Swiss-Prot record:
Pfam families linked to this entry: GcvP2_C, GDC-P
Keywords tagged on the record: Oxidoreductase, Pyridoxal phosphate
A GO MF label: pyridoxal phosphate binding
Essential cofactor(s): pyridoxal 5'-phosphate
Modified residue annotations for N6-(pyridoxal phosphate)lysine: K704
InterPro entries: GcvP, GDC-P_C, GDC-P_N, GDC_P, PyrdxlP-dep_Trfase, PyrdxlP-dep_Trfase_major, PyrdxlP-dep_Trfase_small
EC code(s) of this entry: 1.4.4.2
KW Oxidoreductase (keyword) present: yes
The name this protein goes by in its record: Glycine dehydrogenase (decarboxylating)
Organism: Sinorhizobium medicae (strain WSM419) (Ensifer medicae)
One GO cellular component term noted in the UniProt record for this chain: cytosol
């Protein structure tokens, strides 16, 4: 059959992920945007934006980009290289069942996983309520007064507990006692944290070796890593007598049956909520918890959700006591924690809401009964089982049979834990089935069935729990799945995430988290692998990590990568520890000064302080660049003790500084190293490599540049890249035999989310990644151009360009109309937008980062909203609007405002449907402006009474 003469084949590629799915503007839209910016081509704009002195010489190249289907096939092939074996290794990681209703409606729901940290409380009420449930759950189970909204992992939480103890203890000792029954990874992390700060770690049997007179605190594992369940009440009382602090690392599932740490007198409790429905995922991510006595709440790290009121007096939630955090206190902060594990904390809290106290107790009892049955069978075979009392973990003395039994267990598709040279550890969980127990018995040479053994309790009677927990009605209201689904939907509808609108947060890179990238994280071949399995059972993971590491090295110009840091702040810390170890290895342990510009992110000075360094602040010029005269002077002044400098590139002011190479040369000349914060890597990929311009180490925020979602405040990943001379000092891990420098509980951090970044790289290819960077720069310059005349862009390059973000000045609005940056942020909610980054790095400004994923239409909607806000401020300044009773001061407006009595001098239409706001699909803030002062003065950090829920539902 002949073709019609006018028929032609299209060159349109429907599965071109980079250009059709990830990058927002179409080629035609880019042309329109370039005209507004004033450039004939995208390359011409890039040439004027990125200094030639730092431009990458060779393009990124690692094969053609894959389609979504090709990438998913590659991921499936890789996942199948992981061997699915039932792991009874324990050691803080356990099999768990994620209720499908939670997997579908939380973990796989972009309304939850694409949200940002809830700094804007009005548009985060759903997430904040879920986190308040988490805090309530933790307080109930631990028997303590105040809990935070998650930490990175149990080992990190233990290190934070040690830091609190040193800060608040009356004892002036410089030693910290660690129970030898703590998990090995916890002990390793405690040693890492203590060494730079000059604290001594004493590991031993607390009932024999603890001298409370010489320590500022102690931590005990409950139950212990080898299974022991012990009462620490007497030891804790002795510590208190001598002015020391007591912390307990407790398994929350065990606390359903056991006396709480608070009832023992503990000051701090930490642990992991992983077994509350969060898969092990080769080490993470999981939400750790921390709870403290009320007296220590202001020393607690991380986010803390509290109850406040809005402008109408209605209940509202917000982040409380923020003045203790790194973004406020910098090197004086309680911790460098920024990203935590909000998405996983939400999952754990929903697990408790779904099961309630009866369900949690039943699961705990079932796990214990299965463990008792297992022990009875092993004892019948003649083995010595320790300890006498336990919850879910036993240790078996096997002598020279250790290797044979471990091998036999693997043949039964079961992993057991190797302890020393003569013992085997076994930990059961809610996924353990009768056939699992029978397989273990066979590995030990027995042929039993579970019904041969009657389970009983092997818990000490004096430690059986008698106090209630999860008593709040929220843990009793949603047992029916229909109600559970609706509850999660109601919470999600209160929030504003990327599934509704762009989130133009400067320095946060809220880009597309593509569905194809997210799918593999729930595959059991990735999600059910224990972090301490033999290497030959995780070949898929090792291939993925190695290939992603090679790609990141190619992108950054570094020689080696560590995937262990599970947040950007932990990456900073790991990089600074590598620099410190390098200096010590070269006999320069006296080098402890870190130069940091005043514009640096708050985690920079906080991390430097944790690494044992002295922070020396460097001035920033009026142009937003490092003040070179001051930098040279400080480098010269501290030449003998200079350890490093920390810089962000492009700068936190949104420009490529021309003098970055000179900065690096000055530091190296004076014996220091250069830490380049990779938070703004989205402006560099494919165009410039940190390792080529003089930097020695950087962390990369995979939850920014490489598409891991922010999850409402975590998870994140902060791997570090280093030049060859620092490679020997990358983080080690006890499981790999390298005990020094561990910064996370698992060897590869939050490994189960690495498939997201890997698939992003596969689908974009080197060319696509470079194009994404260029479009990110175009979008930022387009926004700056559209806002020209209404708002001043504070910082530009010599050629008038910004990098991937821009800072607009809202201070003139305050001067002329009394309109604050907070007013602008709240008015943007009425328009359906999350505000840009507020008052950082300059007070009274907004930092806008649109990313490459936003279309021209969405950018225009955002710009229209800001321009309309500027006109409202002008109307106030000119007397056409009241200075107090106006749409800006009263924002955000709610449905209750719309339908209630209206006595305001502006219309409902103007209040609720400003330019930029959708009419049919408008986002409505569930609360009016939240009262921050009230929330801190009347601190409540657990669920409010049930009456308030009934009121909210009316």
């Amino acid at each position: 059959m002949s073709m019609p003469k006018d028929f032609t084949f299209t060159d349109y590629k429907p599965y071109d992920f980079a250009n059709r799915r990830h990058i927002g503007p179409s080629p035609a839209e880019m042309d329109e945007m370039l005209k507004v910016v004033g450039y004939p081509s995208l390359d011409a704009l890039i040439d004027d934006t990125v200094p030639p002195s730092i431009r990458q010489q060779t393009p990124l190249a690692w094969g053609a980009p894959m389609t979504e289907r090709e990438a998913l096939d590659k991921l499936r092939e890789t996942a199948n290289r992981n061997r699915k074996v039932v792991s009874l290794i324990g050691q803080g990681y356990y099999g768990t069942i994620t209720p499908p209703v939670i997997q579908r409606n939380i973990l796989e729901n972009p309304a939850w996983y694409t949200a940002y940290t809830p700094y804007q409380p009005e548009i985060s009420q759903g997430r904040l309520e879920a986190l308040l449930n988490f805090q309530t759950m933790v307080c109930d189970l631990t028997g303590l007064d105040v809990a935070n909204a998650s930490l990175l992992d149990e080992a990190t939480a233990a290190a934070e507990a040690m830091a609190i103890a040193e800060r608040v203890a009356k004892s002036k000792a410089k030693a910290f006692f660690v129970d030898e029954n703590c998990h090995p990874q916890t002990i390793a992390l405690l040693k890492t944290r203590a060494e730079p700060l000059g604290w001594q770690i004493v590991v031993g049997n607390p009932f024999e070796d603890l001298d409370a007179a010489i320590v500022f605190g102690a931590i005990f594992q409950y139950p212990g890593t080898y299974g022991h369940v012990r009462d620490f009440s007497g030891l804790i009382a002795r510590l208190h007598e001598l002015g020391a602090i007591a912390a307990v690392a407790a398994d929350p599932l065990a606390l359903a049956l056991l006396k709480s740490p608070g009832e023992m007198g503990a000051d701090i409790a930490v642990g992991s909520t992983q077994r509350f429905g969060v898969p092990v995922g080769y080490g993470g991510p999981h939400a750790a918890y921390m709870a403290v006595r009320d007296a220590y709440k202001r020393s607690m790290p991380g986010r803390l959700v509290g109850v406040s009121v809005d402008a109408r007096g209605n209940r509202a939630y917000r982040l409380s006591l923020q003045t203790r955090e790194q973004h406020i206190r910098r090197e004086k902060a309680t911790s460098n924690i920024c990203t935590a594990q909000v998405l996983l904390a939400v999952m754990a809290s929903m697990y408790a809401v779904f099961h309630g106290p009866e369900g949690i107790k039943a699961i705990a009892q079932s796990v214990h009964q299965k463990t008792v049955r297992l022990a009875l069978g092993l004892e019948k075979l003649g083995y010595t089982v320790e300890p006498d009392v336990f919850f879910d973990t036993i240790t078996v003395e096997v002598g020279k049979l250790q290797g044979i039994i471990l091998k036999a267990a693997v043949a039964e598709d079961v992993n057991l834990r190797k302890i020393g040279t003569t013992k085997i550890g076994i930990s059961l969980d809610e996924r353990s089935r009768p056939i699992t127990l029978e397989a273990v018995w066979r590995a030990f040479g027995g042929d039993f069935s579970v019904d041969q053994f009657e389970p009983d309790y092997r818990l000490p009677k004096e430690l059986l729990r008698t106090s209630d927990y999860l008593t709040h009605p929220i843990f009793h209201m949603n047992r029916a799945e229909s109600e559970m689904t609706r509850y999660m939907r109601r919470l999600a509808d209160r929030d504003l995430a990327l599934d509704r609108a762009m989130i133009p947060l400067g320095s946060c890179t809220m880009k597309l988290n593509a569905t194809a990238e997210m799918l593999p994280i729930t595959w059991p071949e990735f999600s059910e692998i224990h972090p301490f399995v033999p290497a030959d059972q995780a070949m898929g993971y090792h291939h993925l990590i190695e290939d992603l590491s090679q790609k990141l090295c190619a992108i950054t110009g570094y020689d080696a990568i560590s995937m262990q840091p599970n947040s950007g702040a932990q990456g900073e810390y790991a990089g600074l520890l590598a620099i410190r170890a390098y200096h010590i290895a070269n006999g320069n342990e006296h080098r402890d000064v870190c130069l940091i510009p005043t514009s640096a992110h708050g985690t920079n000075p906080a991390s430097a302080q944790m690494a044992g360094m002295k922070v020396v602040v460097v001035k920033v010029s009026d142009a937003g660049e490092i003040a070179m005269d001051d930098f040279r002077a400080k480098a010269e002044q501290y030449a003998e003790t200079l350890s490093c400098c920390m810089i962000t590139y492009p700068s936190t002011h949104g420009v490529f500084e021309e003098n970055v190479r000179e900065v690096c040369e000055i530091v190296h000349k004076h014996g220091g190293q250069v830490y380049l914060d990779g938070a703004n890597m989205n402006a560099m990929v494919g165009l410039s490599r940190p390792g080529d311009i003089g930097s020695d180490v950087s962390h990369l925020n995979l939850h920014k540049t490489f598409c891991i979602p922010h999850g409402g405040g975590g998870p994140g990943m902060g791997p570090i890249g280093v030049k060859a001379h620092l490679a020997p000092f990358l983080p080690g891990h006890p499981e790999s035999g390298e005990h020094k420098g561990a910064v996370s509980a698992a060897p590869f951090g939050s490994a189960s989310i690495l498939p997201i970044s890997w698939s992003y790289c596969l689908m974009m290819g080197g060319e696509g990644l470079t194009q994404a960077t260029k479009v990110a720069i175009l979008n930022a310059n387009y926004v700056a151009a559209r806002l020209k005349g209404a708002f001043d862009v504070l910082y530009k390059s010599a050629k008038g360009r910004v990098a991937h973000e821009c800072i607009i000045d809202t201070r003139p609005l305050a001067e002329s109309a009394g309109v604050t940056v907070d007013d602008v942020a709240k008015r943007l909610i009425d328009c359906g937008f999350h505000a840009p980054t507020m008052s950082w790095p300059v007070a009274g400004t907004l930092m806008i980062e649109p990313t490459e994923s936003e279309t021209k239409a969405e950018l225009d909607r955002f710009c229209d909203a800001l321009l309309a806000i500027r006109e409202e401020a002008r109307a106030i300044a000119e007397g056409r609007m009241d200075k107090i009773n106006n749409p800006l001061k009263n924002a955000p407006h709610t449905v209750e405002d719309l339908v209630g009595d209206w006595d305001r001098p502006y219309s409902r239409e103007q209040a609720c449907f400003p330019p930029g706001a959708f009419r049919v699909d408008k986002y409505w803030s569930p609360v009016n402006r939240v009262d921050n002062v009230y929330g801190d003065r009347n601190l409540v950090c657990t669920c409010p009474p049930i009456e308030s829920y009934a009121e909210a539902a009316e």
